Amino acid sequence: MARVFPFRGIMFNESLKNQLGDFLCPPFDVVSEDLKEELYDLSEYNVIRLENGKIYKSDNEKDNKYTRASNLFDSWLKNKILIQRNQPTFFILEESFEVMGKYKKRRSIISNVDLYDYEEKVVLPHEKTRKKQKQDRFQLMKTARANFSRIMSVIEDKDSNLINFLIKETSSDPEFEGSIPNMHEFKIWIIDDKDKISFLTNLFELENIFIADGHHRYETALEYKKIIEEKSSRRMMNLVSMNDEGLLLLGYHRAFSGLNDEKLNLLINKLKEFFIFSDVKWEESFFEANYSDEDKIIMVNNNSSTSLSLKENIKSTYEALHTVIESVLSPDEVINHIRYEHDSEEMKRKLDSNELQLCFFMNALSKNYFIDMVSRGKLLPPKSTLFYPKLPTGLVIQYLNDI
């Protein structure tokens, strides 16, 4: 099964640890231009400058966001803004956050993981990727020779060996801690004890790895290994136990805008082949459609709210809705008329202001369903999973010159 390794991770200088939260950013694919501007203003050392820097009209082959990231990375290393650890270690990350008024903690191991082709059935994907995003990540890897963000992956951990280890280790004082503006608090521990390292490497040899967030980055690493450098055979990941109570799998809602009445009516009629319709009050169903494992959808327009319950022979709300959408809309119509959103309050606000015409509030897939489907090699419909919260970028960096 999976082979994991400690590594000489790069972190911000310990003298800057009180400012560490100002240096971090979300994953590259969820950073809007407005947020990017805010992160640039937050700190001259915010890692967005490395992970997904600004693009200028004057950019050319020698001066672009990739070359600027590479040069800045080298500069931060030279000036000891970033420091590479002397010895290979594992890192433990504990994230604390609030969801729907409840306080949660998620714990994970940061490690290097051997790269496996999907056909080897060791690292398992659950979604298709897009070429444009992989080209972007490839160019950054090639130019900067580093990975600034970690892939989030999960393991079944049936005997709870990983989560029990993490709970025990996080009972001591951390090496680093901080908070990320508008996100969450974090703590980091260093694992350099030989016996503990051996325990972890042996533990993962019995596990499959399920990619939770980071398919584009994983496939980019495979491509990099194939084209650029065969010895670059590992990728930095956060590995989380499925038994961690702080591992939240939330729903990704669907919103429609700009569809004509004919398409809308066709969509709703087609849904009746898969779902049983019943009227509900929005106020009663609002929270139900955000953090529940129940297999139903709440459909809302400006005039009514409807609960859609799966018929007996149908297994998944996401698959059923995806089947209906594909049968009614062309690929271009899907791109032009559907938005995906995990914030149900924000989506309802847009619906009330007539920015949207029809919304489907989705419940989360259960963890067991996710494991079962992915283990059998099934790819899930687009935007079926949201492992919340997304990992902050910049806590630990993987240097490709030091595999």
Which stretches of residues belong to each language-model region?
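Surface-exposed, charge/polar-rich loops and edge strands
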Residues: 1-403
